[in-house]
């Protein structure tokens, strides 16, 4: 029997050392993000792929194919409008500061601190009262359903 889960976002109980990640995020130079040839002022990122963490994440989530890890910075008072992530099918997002912003899909809003998201569907980030900093694992070759099923079968059953 297939596990049942929400069609857009699966909150997960998977906490890395957020204090350590937050310290690392603050040390990294932020890179500008370009979409359709235009610089975005509402999204910055910093690659972060130490081997020990890559190995741990890959084994914990059973990641296959292409994926990467990075910090994502969404500025205070900003708004990350409706979009589909470029080329990725899903992601694992951990909010590493105390941001209370929500992610919204066309049919529902979600509050989360750690979650698997379907990035192949249109979504946006709303209520950015303060800066939002994420540790994000982006997956190009695994679908949201595949990643959720692996996580549930490994950690929930």
Locate predicted features.
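A short hydrophobic beta-strand segment most commonly corresponding to one strand
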Residues: 90-95, 114-116, 129-149
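Conserved metal-binding segment of the jelly-roll/cupin
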Residues: 107-128
């Amino acid at each position: 029997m297939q596990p049942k889960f929400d069609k857009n976002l699966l909150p997960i109980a998977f906490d890395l050392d957020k204090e350590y990640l937050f310290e690392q995020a603050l040390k990294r130079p932020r890179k500008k993000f370009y979409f359709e040839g235009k610089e975005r002022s509402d999204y910055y990122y910093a690659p972060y792929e130490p081997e020990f963490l890559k190995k741990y994440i890959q084994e914990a989530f059973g990641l296959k194919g292409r994926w990467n890890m990075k910090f994502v910075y969404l500025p205070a008072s900003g708004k990350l409008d409706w979009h589909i992530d470029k080329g990725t099918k899903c992601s694992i997002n951990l909010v590493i500061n105390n941001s209370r912003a929500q992610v919204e899909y066309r049919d529902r809003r979600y509050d989360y601190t750690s979650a698997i998201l379907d990035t192949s569907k249109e979504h946006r980030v709303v209520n950015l009262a303060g800066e939002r900093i994420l540790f994000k694992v982006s997956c190009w070759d695994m679908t949201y359903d595949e990643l959720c099923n692996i996580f549930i079968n490994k950690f929930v059953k």
